[in-house]
Structure formats: C-alpha cells, structure tokens
Amino acid sequence: MNRALDDEVRRLLKIKNYMARKRVEFHRQEWFRYKKLGDAWRKPRGKHSKLREHLSRRPPIVDAGFRSPAKVRGMHPSGYYEVLVYNLKDIENIDPKIQAARIASSVGSRKREEIAKRCAELNIKVLN
C-alpha cells in the first residue's frame, strides 16, 4: 500500500473494495429470454416496464448508490493511480508518490525489461 496515503484515503479504499465485492451484475431487461439480446446493461424505457418502476422481485437497476467514493474512484487497490506505459519516454511523466506504471500488453519482452529496470531506478511501482 502507498505509504503517502492518509487515513481517510485508506478507509475509503477499504469501503471501495467492500462495495466492489457486493456490487451485483447489471443485466438488461429480459436478457435471458431472447438469444439475440446481449446481457450488457440498457436503461429500461418502456411505458409499462416493471424494472423501470422498481417493482419488487426485480433485479436492481443501475443507480448512483452503487458507485465507489469519489475521492478514490479510478484508484488501484494499492492506492496509486495507474498510468499505462508503452515506452521509456512515458515513464518520465510519472509521479512516483501518487502514480504507478502498468506496462501495456502490446510491449515486447525486451522493451518490457528495459521499462522495468528504469522504473526501479526512479522508484516507480510497476503493477504488472
């Protein structure tokens, strides 16, 4: 965990982790009924839609209450913000106190090794 984090951020990261584990999968209305419908969320807009009206025995609907705390939104569980790195030039823009590097999947093994070595010199955490 990032040592520079204050107690408030640590507490919010724990809450974010807890909320992520409890969050349900949101499926579109009647996704199970027709093969042509994907299960990706679509907001129900029908005039008589039971899901839109939040009737009982219906799956939960996407709502602001399911979001993680604003202060830690987009933050890695380690307490750093992720920065996607493609080459050595990208490393120079990273602030090691609040950001961590994630090497892109398209980077080959030779360049990946160079990037990891440079990150170690600059005390930048590599997430993968």
UniProtKB/Swiss-Prot annotation:
Gene Ontology CC: one annotated term: cytosolic large ribosomal subunit
Domain of life from the UniProt record: Archaea
Keywords assigned by UniProt, alphabetized: Ribonucleoprotein, Ribosomal protein
Signal sequence range: none
Keyword Ribosomal protein: yes
InterPro entries associated with the record: Ribosomal_eL32 (IPR001515), Ribosomal_eL32_arc (IPR023654), Ribosomal_eL32_CS (IPR018263), Ribosomal_eL32_sf (IPR036351)
GO function terms (MF aspect): structural constituent of ribosome
A Gene Ontology BP annotation from the UniProt entry: translation
NCBIfam families: PRK08562.1
Family of the protein in this entry: Belongs to the eukaryotic ribosomal protein eL32 family.
Protein name in the entry: Large ribosomal subunit protein eL32
Naturally occurring in which organism (per UniProt): Thermoplasma volcanium (strain ATCC 51530 / DSM 4299 / JCM 9571 / NBRC 15438 / GSS1)
